[in-house]
Structure formats: structure tokens, C-alpha cells
């Protein structure tokens, strides 16, 4: 059973977050291992496995990028384990430039200001590509959506690096 079916949701990118959370809580109560504490070992193990599946499904569907990756996995794209590299040379150059810019910001005397500007640009790039991905998934353009998700994964990793740098800069001020 796929995660969308498990939660009673249509298999689409745009989902009702409150419905997801409500169904998650219902399933958690229904399959909580404590409810099976006095049952035979086989039933206890089955409830543990079901609870783990429910948790994995919820974490996947809750997170927009993971949800997109999961939708693509249902179409045969295993983005989590692939060695596929992007052939978009313009994007590859953009990646290099963004990483170099972030490295330069870290060494800059006004790093906080530059990092705020960089972070805003990164947020706009992520928003633009996310909108494109939503359109592609909606039109079932799986190959194009997979490429866009690969690019969003890079931007997501870069955002994590920005947050780490912010923490280091904040710690240096303390």
C-alpha cells in the first residue's frame, strides 16, 4: 500500500496538511505498540512494523521535497539512490558560483549582511523551482519534475549550509 492510500489522500503533490496530521494521529493510536503489549509476539512485531511504516509515511508526505521524491518513486524514479547527474551545465555552473559565493561570505567582514542577502536570493530561487515542480507533477511530466527535484535537493543542501554558517556567525558574536 502506498503512503497516499495509507493516509486516505489522493496521490497528488498538493495535499491537505491538516487531514494528513489528523489521519496520522488516528493511525498512531490504532497501531501504537503499547496496544499490543499483551498480544502474541507476532502481533507485537506486526504492530511495530506498521507503526514504523506510518511514521515513515508521515515524515515523507509532510516534507514537500520528500513528498515529491516519493511521488516520483511511484513512477519509477529512485532519486534517493540514484547516481544520475544533472546534464544542465548552466545549473552546474550556478551551483559552483553559489558555493563559491557562500565560501566568500564566510570570510567576509560583513558576513551577516551578505548572508542575509544570499539567503533571500536562495529562498527566491527555491520558491521559483518549487512552483515549477508543482506544475510539472500536476501535468505528470515525470522526467522534467525529476530534474527539478534534483535541483531543489541541491538548493535544500545549500540552505542547510547557510543555516550552519548563520549558527557559526551567531556563536562567534556570543
Swiss-Prot record:
Organism classification: Bacteria, Pseudomonadati, Pseudomonadota, Gammaproteobacteria, Enterobacterales
Keywords from the named record: Chaperone
Family: Belongs to the HscB family.
Superkingdom to which the source organism belongs: Bacteria
Keyword match Ribonucleoprotein: no
Name of this chain's protein: Co-chaperone protein HscB
Gene from which this protein is expressed: hscB
GO cellular component, one term: iron-sulfur cluster transfer complex
GO BP terms in the entry: [2Fe-2S] cluster assembly; protein complex oligomerization; protein folding
PROSITE patterns: DNAJ_2 (PS50076)
Amino acid at each position: 500500500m502506498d503512503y497516499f492510500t495509507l493516509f486516505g489522500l489522493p496521490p497528488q503533490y498538493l495535499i491537505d496538511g491538516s487531514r494528513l496530521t489528523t489521519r496520522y494521529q488516528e493511525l498512531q493510536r490504532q497501531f501504537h505498540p503499547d496496544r499490543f503489549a499483551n498480544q502474541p509476539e507476532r502481533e507485537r512485531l506486526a504492530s511495530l512494523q506498521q507503526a514504523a511504516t506510518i511514521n515513515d509515511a508521515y515524515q515523507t508526505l509532510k516534507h514537500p521535497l520528500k513528498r515529491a521524491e516519493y511521488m516520483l518513486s511511484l513512477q519509477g524514479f529512485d532519486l534517493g539512490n540514484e547516481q544520475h547527474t544533472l546534464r544542465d551545465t548552466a545549473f552546474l555552473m550556478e551551483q559552483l558560483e553559489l558555493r563559491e559565493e557562500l565560501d566568500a561570505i564566510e570570510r567576509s567582514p560583513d558576513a551577516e549582511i551578505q548572508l542575509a542577502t544570499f539567503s533571500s536570493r536562495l529562498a527566491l530561487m527555491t520558491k521559483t523551482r518549487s512552483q515549477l515542480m508543482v506544475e510539472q507533477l500536476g501535468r505528470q511530466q515525470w522526467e522534467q519534475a525529476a530534474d527539478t527535484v534534483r535541483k531543489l535537493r541541491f538548493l535544500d543542501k545549500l540552505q542547510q549550509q547557510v543555516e550552519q554558517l548563520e549558527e557559526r556567525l551567531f556563536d562567534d558574536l556570543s
